A protein has these predicted regions:
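Non-catalytic alpha/beta scaffold blocks inside enzyme catalytic domains
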Residues: 1, 10-168
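Long, K/E/R/D-enriched contiguous segments that form extended
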Residues: 6-8
Length: 169
C-alpha cells in the first residue's frame, strides 16, 4: 500500500481542494478510482478500505496490469457482486452474479461526440427477446434501487408506461 503516483497530500484532502481515494489518496480520474489502485484500496489495513464492490460488465480479475493482485483483492472483499452476461474470472470470484440480457436482446445506444460539431447518437433495437428473467443493466439497476427503497415508484411507473407504449421511428 501507500501513496502512489498522482497521490494527493493529507493537507489537500483535509482542505477539500483535491479529491482522492480514501486509502492511498490517489487522484480520481473523472470522478472514478483508477483501476490499478483498487487492490491497494481493498488490501491495505485501513478503516476506510473498500469492503464491497459492484462490478458491471468488466473483468478486472483478468484485464488489469497486476491481475493476480486484483484477484487476491477481490477474493478478500466482504461482498462482491458482478453484473455481466458472461461468467468471467471476476464473476467466478463473486458472492453474487446478476446475469443480464446480451447485446442482441436489449436496446443499446452509443453517443459519438468525436465528430464535433456534428455529434451522433446511435440507437439499436433488440434483435430478439431476452431469455426469461434477464433484463438490461438499466432495468436491473432500477429494480435494485426500488428494492432498497431508494427510488420513488411514481416517476418510474410513468417511464415504464411510456416505454411499453413506444412510438414509431
Amino acid at each position: 500500500g501507500g501513496a502512489g503516483v498522482g497521490a494527493i497530500s493529507a493537507e489537500q484532502q483535509d482542505a477539500g481542494s483535491a479529491k482522492g481515494t480514501p486509502v492511498t489518496g490517489s487522484l480520481l480520474i473523472g470522478g472514478l478510482t483508477p483501476c490499478n489502485v483498487i487492490p491497494d484500496e481493498i488490501l491495505t489495513d485501513h478503516p476506510k478500505r473498500f469492503r464491497a464492490m459492484l462490478v458491471e460488465c468488466a473483468n478486472p480479475a483478468h484485464s488489469l496490469a497486476d491481475s493476480a493482485r486484483m484477484r487476491d483483492a477481490l477474493a478478500s472483499l466482504d461482498l462482491l457482486v458482478v453484473i455481466d452476461v458472461a461468467l468471467s474470472e471476476t464473476a467466478r470470484l463473486a458472492h453474487y452474479v446478476l446475469p443480464v440480457a446480451s447485446q442482441f436482446e436489449k436496446a443499446e445506444a452509443t453517443f459519438f461526440n468525436f465528430e464535433f460539431p456534428d455529434n451522433y447518437f446511435h440507437l439499436r433495437r433488440p434483435l430478439m427477446p431476452a431469455l426469461p428473467g434477464l433484463f438490461s443493466e438499466a432495468e436491473l439497476h432500477c429494480r435494485l434501487l426500488e428494492a432498497l427503497g431508494e427510488l420513488p415508484a411514481e416517476p418510474i411507473a410513468a417511464l415504464r408506461a411510456a416505454w411499453k407504449e413506444g412510438r414509431q421511428a
